[in-house]
């Protein structure tokens, strides 16, 4: 029975012995404490100011105001700078902004900004100062921090030093629940470096220069590297789905389809400002978030218009300039927002308004245009036809925001932007429709970015639909795949044609006009994979249940050149054709020597595993692996050799090749010798075991009085019996032989 008032003792009711101070209600006070953010969330405290007197104070306030107004709006009368008893300032100021969002932006963008050579600003929210600086939060006595002993970090580029001295590349394989990193051993079994169970929950991904291996988990993203494969960085973005690096590995973007929800107890990396956001941009060096963004809403159809199809999810949603100084985001149909790094403030405080903009893409390298000496990064964009205005392709320079080249286009159904790897060319694949909109054709508009004035060359109209396009890396040739039938989900994929294009020969270093080299018809190909070094290309049929062809081409074949191609800068030759049933992915290694193809269990469960080919299309290795999910070569950073050193290597390439071939032959022969020796050793061990058993059996027979050779003894015992029981028999055999045949005809 529950206790009642009658069960209480008299001493329990004695109020004189009750002390209010002894009751601990700190948990209740903390739970129901009034938060100061409600009244002071638009205030910031600016620390690190120079010491000034009353006469110098107005000048400092005006100078400080210029900095403060770069992120929001405030006035001189909203800046309070306390003065000491000696008439000098206390080196900090209180500033009121017009909104809490501006105050938050000031803390994010002005903190650690230099005011001059000797002073650096520290900006914090007033509410944060009160929250973290109140009584009990800070010790009155100074406690020196514990300085940990210096520990030398592992070299994150150690993978560039192959211990075998053969310059091998590494790759990662994700199969079942296991992730392993291996050295490529060509025909032999890959050499395992590290293999771990449950290393990732969804997928793995290399960083662009190969420094880190990314694992993805429900709690966030982790980066691994070094000889011992320890965790180097951690980014706590709950339920992360996708990851993208900046080209130079300085920054990272994470995305989750679930908006971030900050719990009441807080988050180890994110703040309340990140609540409800989907994207987070991180600084890899510090592992700290720079800024977060929410998912953009799909624009609704205008009244009276048919509802638009849901667009494909854009990834990467944030695109990086080649030097990591800018990151940009598309607001479809309205603008492009360009942010400066690492502050993540909007360039010139405004987005670049481009009516109707559909897509954009940065140049993959910093381009030096003819006659332009100033620094710039370039991106291209395109807009569709709006009313009577034509479609337009533009080339914009950043940070000036100047459109350096534009091109008007008519009767445009769609356009795709394709940069060459060095930014020397931009190809705009334009799908055009006839006036009746019943037929379509494709034109290729090629911008020669490095030439003066950025001239545009139009390649002959292609009547078929172009379904794939790929530039030669560091080159000026390209391959397209076309089809005469509409592209879509069909039971039998349509037949395709593969066309090769290259420039004409020109004097000096000039690049001639682009010309058609050759078209191969009645193919099933749908994907193009160039070697990262150029020259060689694999044209493949992937994710196709009917066909799985792999065609290996050489565009600089050293054999006889057809007369029709004498004036062109290519000599096309099919080197080999392979077949990998169920192939879903193809990837070249960074050296351009090997090609890996694999059938991923993420797409189907038939004959999962990988094949390895050399650049000529000769199969080196085939391995079927159950639940094989992912294969990815480890990227290499750019070479440290100068152009002169690279030219010297090319001049002496034949001599190097002879040395490498000799080393390969020695390695193969030594491997063969090792196999023979191992087999001989096993055979000798077996002979020794057999002899030991024979002696042991002989000793046991001698002990038990048994004959040493039971078979011989048995034959000896049976022979007399057979001689007496059987009579002597004579066996005769008669054989007939035809010596001659004569045929007579009787009439």
From Swiss-Prot:
WD repeats lie at residues 195-234, 236-292, 310-349, 520-563, 578-623. InterPro entries: EIF3B (IPR011400), eIF3B_RRM (IPR034363), Nucleotide-bd_a/b_plait_sf (IPR012677), RBD_domain_sf (IPR035979), RRM_dom (IPR000504), TIF_beta_prop-like (IPR013979), WD40/YVTN_repeat-like_dom_sf (IPR015943). Residues 42-128 form the RRM domain. It is found in: Cytoplasm. It comes from the Eukaryota. It holds the Pfam family eIF2A. One of its GO terms (cellular component) is multi-eIF complex. One of its GO terms (molecular function) is RNA binding. Keywords: Cytoplasm, Initiation factor, Protein biosynthesis, Repeat, RNA-binding, WD repeat. SUPFAM superfamilies: DPP6 N-terminal domain-like, RNA-binding domain, RBD. GO terms for biological process: formation of cytoplasmic translation initiation complex; translational initiation. Belongs to the eIF-3 subunit B family. Component of the eukaryotic translation initiation factor 3 (eIF-3) complex. RNA-binding component of the eukaryotic translation initiation factor 3 (eIF-3) complex, which is involved in protein synthesis of a specialized repertoire of mRNAs and, together with other initiation factors, stimulates binding of mRNA and methionyl-tRNAi to the 40S ribosome. The eIF-3 complex specifically targets and initiates translation of a subset of mRNAs involved in cell proliferation. This is Eukaryotic translation initiation factor 3 subunit B.
